[in-house]
Amino acid sequence: RGWGSDEKKDREEEXEQQ
């Protein structure tokens, strides 16, 4: 129940970088 939040943050950061 912790990696789920990490994955969402990673996806949001990737979209901003792209």
Curated annotation (Swiss-Prot):
This is Trypsin inhibitor HSTI. Inhibitor of serine proteases. Can inhibit trypsin but is ineffective against chymotrypsin, papain and elastase. Strongly inhibits the trypsin-like protease activity isolated from the third instar larva of P.truncatus, and also inhibits more weakly the trypsin-like protease activity isolated from the third instar larva of M.sexta. Protects the plant by inhibiting proteases of invading organisms. Coiled coil: none annotated. GO terms for cellular component: extracellular space. One of its GO terms (molecular function) is toxin activity. Detected in seeds (at protein level). The keyword Ribonucleoprotein does not apply. Keywords: Protease inhibitor, Serine protease inhibitor.
